[in-house]
Amino acid sequence: MENVINVWEEYGLTRSWNNPKLDIQRKANTQKDLFFVGVFSNKIIATAMFGYDGHRGWLNYFAVLPQFQKSGFGKQLLEFGELLLVDKGCPKLNLQIRANNKEAINFYKAVGYNEDEVISFGKRLIED
């Protein structure tokens, strides 16, 4: 668990209002078959937390350690998750990116994702 969180922290995904250990535990209780890590030389270098609610797929905590970015690991992990979602009948995969994360925006555009004309809303139901 700590190795996964280290990837998230190094990539800058963790936030003070989200407890990453609780997020991992919650995912382990819900569609744990859609939570993946990428490993290179026995070290976790990438993570992806996919989900499917019967209408849309979602991707969270997608991260690749900086020293392994632009090497194809992220694309390979993303495509693997996409194939699993297609097998489950998922017609579309959605994800959210912080507006200032230009590298992620460029990555997703390069692998065929388009910006949707939507506004994202959220409401915290359980405090971490």
Listing of model-derived features with the role each one plays in the protein:
Residues 1-61, 65, 80, 84, ...:
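Acetyl-CoA-dependent GNAT
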Residues 3, 76, 103:
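Charged catalytic carboxylate motif
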Residues 58-61, 96, 107:
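Residue-level recognition of specific faces of alpha-helices
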Residues 65-71, 99-100:
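Active-site acidic-Proline motif in GNAT/NAT acetyltransferases
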Residues 68, 72-80:
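Conserved acetyl-CoA pyrophosphate-binding loop and the N-cap/start of the following alpha-helix
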Residues 78, 85-97:
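Conserved GNAT acetyl-CoA-binding A-motif
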Residues 95-104, 122-127:
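Conserved beta-strand-loop-alpha-helix junction that forms the acyl-donor binding cleft
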Residues 108, 113:
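Conserved active-site tyrosine of GNAT-family acetyltransferases
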